[in-house]
Every structure is written in C-alpha cells, then in structure tokens.
Design a protein with these regions (language model features):
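Short, conserved glycine- and acidic-residue-centered signature motifs
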Residues: 26, 30, 86-91
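Conserved catalytic cores of phosphodiester-cleaving nucleases, focusing on short active-site segments
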Residues: 37, 56-80, 88, 94
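Short acidic/glycine-enriched loop/turn segments that link adjacent beta-strands
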Residues: 52-54, 124
Length: 135
C-alpha cells in the first residue's frame, strides 16, 4: 500500500517537529506511521518499547492480530530503500523482542504479525509504504 501526501501537509508536520528539540528523522517517520495507523483505526498499545535487547517501534492491534511494526525512514533519493535496511539480523531481533513483549505482558495464544512501514521523505512530500506480514 502506498500513500502520497502533498507539500502543504508535510510543511505543517515539519514545522511542528522543528519546534521540538533534537527530533531525528526516525522520530519523524514514527510520528507519520503512528498517525497513519490511527487513521486506519488501529489500537496502538505501545510505542518505542525497549529492553536491553533492543526496541520495538510500534505495537498495535489490527482486529484480533497483535502487530509488531518496524518503521524505517530515509531521505530520498537514496541508494538503498528503507525496505532493504531490514536484514536477517534485524528480523531475528524483532522476533526475540516480540516474544519478550508477549511473555512480559502475558499475551498468549494471540495471532501475531510483523509489519513494515517504509517512509521516504523529500523536501516537499513523503511516500509511505505499508507491508503487512513482511516476515
């Protein structure tokens, strides 16, 4: 799924982010992904859930499914797409973190899914691609 946003909309988002100190490109991407999922009426249950092993960007319910969402953001044009930045090592880490989250919160016998939201930004707009069940 691909969504394009026009210049005016991105300008307001970037203006808001500019008022916050130390905002990274990744924070911008996670904020856009969060707004996208809320617009689609997903129930967000955690953001930036951390352990010593790493971090899960977003965790949400999409109907009965517990979904672990990895958000990748890049400036366009770039040599590598955001999708290609999720290698086997990162996939293994996401899986370990997901099971750790489920164990800690006693969430057993739930259908789970791993989604990827890839965002490419430019000076005027951004492109969001949502890959459901990417691993």
């Amino acid at each position: 799924m691909e969504v394009r946003i026009r210049k005016g909309r991105v300008s307001r988002v970037r203006a808001w982010l500019a008022t916050r100190k130390g905002v990274r490109l990744g924070d911008f991407g996670e904020w856009i992904a969060l707004k996208y999922l809320l617009f689609r009426r997903w129930d967000i249950i955690a953001r930036n859930w951390r352990t010593r092993q790493g971090e899960l960007d977003l965790i949400a319910y999409d109907g009965p499914d517990l979904v672990f969402i990895e958000v990748r953001t890049r400036h366009a044009p770039t040599q590598f797409s955001p999708e290609k930045s999720v290698d086997g090592k990162k996939r293994d880490q996401l899986e370990r973190l997901a099971y750790s989250f489920m164990e800690r919160h006693e969430l057993y016998d739930l259908p789970i899914r791993f989604d990827l939201i890839a965002i490419e930004t430019s000076a005027r707009d951004y492109c969001l691609r949502h890959y459901s069940g990417f691993m």
